[in-house]
Amino acid sequence: MSAEASEAHEAQVKMEVSADQESEIAAVQQIASVGVSADADADADADADADADADADADADADADADADLDADADADADADADADAEADVDHDDKPDAEGDVEVQTDSIAADVKAASENEPAQSANAKMDESQATPQPMAESKLDDHQQQDSQLVSPQAGSSNQPPQPHKYMTVEQRKQLFEERIRIDPRDGEAWLNLIEEAQSREDMAATRALYDRFFKVFPNQARQWLAYLDLELAHSNFAQVEAIFNQCLRTTPSVDLWKFYLSYTRRVNPLAPSTGAEEDPAREQTRRVLEGAYEFALRFIGNDKDSGSIWTDYILLIKEREARGGWKEGQKMDDLRRVYQRAVSVPLTNIETIWKDYDAYENGLNKLTAKKFLAERSPAYMTARRVLRDLKAYSDPLVKPLLPRVPVWTTSALAGDAAQDPAQWQRERQQADAWIEYLKWEESNPLLLEDVAILQARVTSAYRRATMYLRFYPEVWYLASRYLVSILRVDEAATWLKNGMEACPGSFLLHFAYAELGEARKSTSDCAAVFDGLLDHVHAQIDARQAKLQQDLKTVDLEADRTKAQAATRRANEGDGDVDVDGEERERERKAGELLQIRKQELQAAAKPEIEGLKEASALVWIKYMHFLRRTEGIRPARSVFSRARKSPHCTWQVFEASALMEYHCSKDAVVATKVFELALKTFGSDEAFVVRYLDFLISMNDDSNARALFERVIGTFAPERARPIWERWAKYEYNFGDSVAIQKLESRLAETYPDEPATKRFIARSSYMDLDLVGPRDLGIRAAMAGASAADRAVEAAKDGGAEEGPRRKTMQEMKRLAAESAQDDTSGDWARPGASSSAGGAGGPPVKKFKRDSASPAPAAFNNQAVGQQVAGPRDAWNEFPESVLVFMEMLPSAQLFDGPMFKPEDIIDCIRSANVPVGGGARRGAAGYGGAGRGRYR
């Protein structure tokens, strides 16, 4: 080691008085290692070395030596000469303690660093290395194999989103990084990246107690992750903790269908139960006992993992173990022959990747015993073998595209409200939906019994094993758990189905699908004792999300206020420093303060507007749980317990009007009490009278009871409290009633009031509303050229089409409730502000001087928007022969953004006319140098043809 480096080392040892100071020294040395400026190097050296000369940065070679003593990379040391290699074995006692320093360096890297520090020419070469190579690897980086690197983007719960969790930086101390990851886990226990970093940090310190504690916490969230179980087993086995290893096997083997994990178990079993060589004696009880233990272990493994296509090596090892069995005597030879034939016949019936090799071995084995009996046995098993070999090709087509991430992640459509816009990323949404659909198609294929198995027990074991594999990688997808429970119900294993739903609720604590399904299953099997706790737990989860989102909003508003106060204080300080502190603020300064106040209010309004859809959506989610809770109790226990739940719900600060309506309708239809129902609506009107959607529902209820006097009184009472643009749904609902059941005087009065409220609305629109009934409309499509919103020859066909598009079919491009509301709101705005025209019509009704024509919306409800047919989408993303692969992902994302065709009710254009318009448009397509006739619709237009 050079003299300069030795002096730096001695000075550093003197400065090691606390762990915090050690971390600061490490951070400074890291800065020096990546090549900061000479001034920064001098400051860092002054902090780390109190005895260094003032000109420590003048000597570049000395700096390189000092840096290499701590941070030189192992790859750069390969360029050192033979002298450096000879010094690599120098004792490490003269190096400073690594505790609190760069803790991810291995012993080999430390040895290479020591060797490199003794070779000055090599250090000069190392100084020219790229910064990314010279910087030590941070603790948080996981060393993944190729398959893990392919799926590593799926580890983070918000991977690929704009709302990434906070990441550590290289200047953080070890304790700071640990606190950061612990905080991330506290916020989101399913943050796999944070878990892996914490475990890696504990292992780097060789703290077995901390590592065990972290693994125990980790496996409560990720109980089926084979890679982490294997890492845990390797760690315990490296310390010869055999009791701990066996305890881990008891925890994970039965619930983790991983071939690698079971191979590890068999390897461990053979290690602790070594099969002694044969002594040649007639009987060797110890060896016979060991052999029985090993064969029992293989039978145990094959019972759980033998259906996996990658378990072929376990089958071949088991066959080899039986072949090596010593058998003396006729009955023992016969037993060995029967056992071997039985294992062969089981193996060739499973679609294994090495099934052809096993079949050839079986063929040779049978022919080696007796060629006459071989034909009989081979002919019996040949159909099963041919079926398995054929199914193997289909199995590969279904299973090869399946995504198997390093750790399961939470899908974007089930993330919490705190995720913000991350759950609205269409590209990520589509990608994860395709991955889930691929697994679901594979599971459906397994349920279809492609092997034509006659043994029901074997078929059921194979399907349930497939579902277990699916939950290994899609643990946080409620759909998989639900489908597994439905399959178990279909084969009359109801109790096991309930267990799957319970496990699914633990994995997906906020899943409405699983909680509702569990309550439904409990009701079906007359076991409802724990269903109330299921509803209460789901309510607590949703309410906690609402409170957290509201707290985040208040924190954001407080931060904005603090920033504004800080700006004001800085302005006051500036004026005081300029000598204007006692002088009145001039007009220009007051104007700046006024504008700053306006900007502050705008910023607050933006934050509130951004949070409102999330909070309102969560409140509606809470309302749905309350409603389903009431319905469940009414069916199982009667109306009184349901009323008790309603009493609890209306006292909640997060209750919405839907809960009141559900209770009122329940009283009306189940208790046959219209008076109580009306009182519930009136109670809700006091709180939600400003909600036009609730008013419309109340009107519907009164009209359905034929209580026209109260309905008219309600309409007159509330219509004046709404602005015209907000009152549109109420006007439309009352107009629909008057058009159908009112007299001519009432209709004329209503038309006059509508004309006063909406003076720009065309008369033709109101006439269409008066002349139509539900979805029967002839004036619009036949006389005015307005295409019908719903296609179909009859009302029945239109109803079927509406149910197909707006129903609850599965599909990756089904719109969320929030997006539906956004589309509805935009449509409502279009009713009052958009332009409405038919082909050939002028921009005003009746010619010049008339009011502008508005966009027309039908009274009948449009179906839910869907960009594609759901069934077709599910098929194209899941099957082995993908029919949509020709479309780039960006095109699919754009197509997904397009609204449904049924939402369009304006004028229809011919595609040929649009293409001709595009062809003749003067659109610049090139840069300035190439701009000309070809770029403005000249010769360049030929490329459209």
Curated annotation (Swiss-Prot):
Q: Where is this region: Disordered?
A: 1-24, 36-171, 568-590, 801-868
Q: Which GO terms describe its biological process?
A: mRNA 3'-end processing; RNA 3'-end processing
The species this protein was found in: Mycosarcoma maydis (Corn smut fungus)
Cite the InterPro entries for this sequence. Answer: HAT, Rna14-like, Suf, TPR-like_helical_dom_sf
Where this protein primarily resides, as one coarse class?
nucleus
**Bias type Polar residues, positions:** 120-136, 150-164
Origin superkingdom: Eukaryota
Q: Where in the cell is it found?
A: Nucleus; Cytoplasm
Asked if the Swiss-Prot or TrEMBL record annotates the protein with the keyword Cytoplasm, the reply is yes
Q: Where are the HAT repeats?
A: 172-204, 206-238, 240-271, 289-324, 335-368, 416-448, 458-490, 602-635, 672-704, 706-740
Its recorded name reads mRNA 3'-end-processing protein RNA14
